[in-house]
Amino acid sequence: MSLRFTNSLTSRTEAFEPLTEGKASIYCCGVTVYDLCHLGHARSYINWDVLRRYLIWRGYDVTYIQNYTDIDDKILNRANEEGITMQAVSERNIEAFEVDMGRLNILPADRMPRATGCIEGIQTLISELESKGAAYSSDGDVYFDISKAKNYGKLSGRDPDDQQQGASGRTADGEESRKRHPFDFALWKGAKAGEPSWESPWGPGRPGWHIECSAMVRQELGQTIDIHLGGGDLVFPHHENEIAQSETANGTTLAKLWMHNGMVNVGGTKMSKSLGNFTTIRALLDSGISPMTLRLFVLQAHYRKPLDFTAEALEAAATGWKGLNAALSLGGRHGESLGWSTAAPLAEGAMNADGGPADTALVELEQRFISAMDDDLNSSGGLAVLFDLAKPLRSLANRLERGEDAALPELELKGLEGRWQLLRHLAAVLGLRSEAEAAPSLDDGAIDVAIAARKAAKAAKDFAEADRIRDELAAQGVELIDKPGGVTEWIRA
């Protein structure tokens, strides 16, 4: 089976055929940094982290861009509430986001542009739309005229003839009266007293929400990309409007493939800050829920399906992770006494190199994993393979933990070692890492050496080795926090 994903644009599962063979350009809509992130954000970024890891593992050269929306009404409102600047609110929440993502073992994007760093590109894009008659000024604002877009509504299925007020999303007071059509949306908002603003051909002001992503996609990846990612709540209006303005300006397709994750529900209702039914990532992790339990909880469901958040479901994930972790940490805890190699996990295909492993069942298990993940990123199917691999390893781990003699025939031990190697190899593809009991902590110099080695592994796109180094540090009570620009900070957990 070829690698296939469900395209939100066509509602069909399609073979992945990138613009350039062997490469994948991906843009993921990032957070609006006005508050801490909740479990819904965790779900989205865990899913897309696995997509990225899997594509890399399958041999693709992936360029992954994720933005920060750091100018928005929500940020301005929070700044006014707290009596601080918009920048202070943004910086605080960007830092918190990066810490949360690091704890969840989510790889940092290759680049993380900010809307405020793309003002020139935004203004250029608006000018191009204006020159094509697709933008108009109204009382200090500039709006996109949806009648100039081809097939507006093709992503969401919305009909522009539906005269729904506020349809463009994030509308300001009185904005509807300044628009020609309810679906028209702001490209540039005229300056208001006390708000940050930038000079422009239309007077001082700031960008609208949708134009920011269109400009950052073009700035970072060009006019057409392979995959555009986001939550299902962004299909309309945000992604619909991105398509309209980008394709009108550029005259070409914005993204070949659109992928959207399902929502996290609480009591049958979408988790959201506006409804007040959310739980932050930080609160969950600080309450004692392990990061890998949270990852497992998310990956047990297909990324497109709704995910019900209940105490029972989280407890079940914790139980599942306890067993999986026992198997994953077996080599680290007892590998030396068993004579096992604790080198980095093998690359894809290495399990059947040179005629294949002694146990052909491992080849079949790896192929089951690939078949599941190739089928629209079926992470629950991938996890099933991990649990199958883990069963005999858990039994051995339990015997060793009880101090029982683990004397086994050499061939059987060798087979279990191969099973463990494949388990941690595939677990790394899903971003799952063992959480061993903390050993005596390293000194600062040793930590710095390990971080340098991990940085070199990441530069070589050897993420399995990078994860192995992170795991070893975590086992010794050192937590790494990756930040944009290749910077890694650490704390003693």
Swiss-Prot record:
Region Disordered: start-end pairs: 154-179
Cofactor section: Zn(2+)
Motif ('KMSKS' region): 270-274
Gene Ontology process terms (BP): cysteinyl-tRNA aminoacylation
Binding site for Zn(2+): C29, C213, H238, E242
Subcellular compartments: Cytoplasm
Domain of life: Bacteria
NCBIfam families per record: cysS
Family per similarity comment: Belongs to the class-I aminoacyl-tRNA synthetase family.
UniProt KW Glycoprotein keyword: no
One Pfam family in the UniProt entry: tRNA-synt_1e
List of residues binding ATP: K273
Organism: Synechococcus sp. (strain CC9605)
Subunit structure, interactors included: Monomer.
Catalytic activity as recorded in UniProt: tRNA(Cys) + L-cysteine + ATP = L-cysteinyl-tRNA(Cys) + AMP + diphosphate
Cofactor annotation remark: Binds 1 zinc ion per subunit.
A GO cellular component annotation in the UniProt record: cytosol
Molecular function as annotated in GO: ATP binding; cysteine-tRNA ligase activity; zinc ion binding
Identification of the protein by name: Cysteine--tRNA ligase
Underlying gene: cysS
Motif 'HIGH' region, chain ranges: 31-41
HAMAP family linked: Cys_tRNA_synth
Catalytic activity, EC: 6.1.1.16
Family annotation (SUPFAM superfamilies): Anticodon-binding domain of a subclass of class I aminoacyl-tRNA synthetases (SSF47323), Nucleotidylyl transferase (SSF52374)
Gene3D superfamilies reported for this sequence: Cysteine-tRNA ligase, C-terminal anti-codon recognition domain, HUPs
